């Protein structure tokens, strides 16, 4: 591990020199490329340097233990205990930082939420999830943009697609893909019985145009009048757009903007993200079957998380974590939940490396 870290530190120092080279400074494209590469190494280099400082401190404390002065020995013993604990903490952090990085981690995300089992109640729950992720994004200082929405009569969503733009958005939200289940008394239920409904969530990294080149000849583009809740036509111009990617059969519709051009741009962003995800799945056969089961049919039996309103709890079934603060979670306070999923994923990766 130390050898790897020393190579990284050496590369970091080389980049520092390059960034002050007048020739590089004049070439902004090269300078930005080097600056981005160095920024990606800063945390691991800072942690490694702190680790080396702790190792030096341990050597110094052990030398003090050999002194004849009892007070110095006691001071050194206390310091040594603290330094050894810090050493273990930094070693663990360095192991995590050395794990292979998901190339999509720093990307923006497109979140697709679809109502599953449960009719209108499932559509209302899809709306709850949309607001939960939007509020989480607000807490992070990220930007959200509604790309597409298919409303129901009472304010829910049959489907809603949102773009979240922010540094590391995909790394934080990628484990949200799957079936989310809700248990509560529906607003439409007069007898007070608890119902179970489901909604599916798919989290896709946003694809840049350079990553996914779409041949215009492989697209069928249909335009139609956009409709609002209940299916009524909200304008008489054909501003809504449906794009079909003929080779894959992927279909994307967008009707939220009054401008056909803007709807087309939004639909293309979603299409590129879905094509990138398809390419990733084909490269990783396991991921393909994993996403199919995660997105699935929205059936209540294939769940990753349950939101239980009567008990005020949220349970993530993959890691066995239950939190009794459903209200704050639905208000976007997701850090504890997401961090636990990231930590579990890192621990599993570390096991495979041992």
Swiss-Prot record:
Protein name as catalogued: Peptide chain release factor 1
HAMAP family linked to this entry: Rel_fac_1
Keywords: Cytoplasm, Methylation, Protein biosynthesis
Source species of the chain: Heliobacterium modesticaldum (strain ATCC 51547 / Ice1)
Localization of this protein: Cytoplasm
UniProt cross-references to InterPro entries, sorted A to Z: PCRF (IPR005139), Pep_chain_release_fac_I (IPR000352), Pep_chain_release_fac_I_sf (IPR045853), Prokaryotic/Mito_RF (IPR050057), RF-1 (IPR004373)
GO molecular function, one term: translation release factor activity, codon specific
Similarity field: Belongs to the prokaryotic/mitochondrial release factor family.
Main location: cytoplasm
Pfam families assigned: PCRF (PF03462), RF-1 (PF00472)
Post-translational modification: Methylated by PrmC. Methylation increases the termination efficiency of RF1.
GO cellular component: cytoplasm
